[in-house]
Amino acid sequence: MTISPVSHNTRPESQLLPQEAAAFDLLDKLGIEYDRVSHDAAFNMELCAEVSRVLDVSVCKNLFLCNRQKTAFYLLCMPPDKPFHTKDLSAQIGSSRLSFAPEESLWELLRCHPGSATILGLANDTEHRVRLLIDREVCDAPFFSCHPCICTSTLKLKTADVLEKLLPHTGHTPVIVDL
């Protein structure tokens, strides 16, 4: 995988996809500073491990989930090395067994494609149909990482900015879980 060896604190100068431009616009509007690295598409956590080294941050694993009926949707932000057990998480949040949500729902609700699910996509969930679940370990870390709605770039944000600026703006209150 090709990764830019240099991180930047500005948006890319190249042409951006609409959802990517909207993510950077939101960060600018909220005064949230970030470090950014560009890279080849990172569709799995093994590739993201290389990005972690460049940005000096643990890249979050973001899973877009739903209940069996596909009536409740969840974005789970968790450490990359923690195992995910649907039964345990379902019990913590009082939901029926969870599974991965359909690709169409990911696009409809967060304006993201598979591999690029991100907390920044919650800005597109204006009807608040997605519940945000964050593992306690992620909340306790000083920095938070995510894609800007596209999997060819990764951002390093202050966790405090995510919790105190971004989420109040989107209107999503995180549910803290212990995986």
Task: Name what the model sees in each region.
Residues M1-L179:
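Extended, low-hydrophobicity, polar/charged segments
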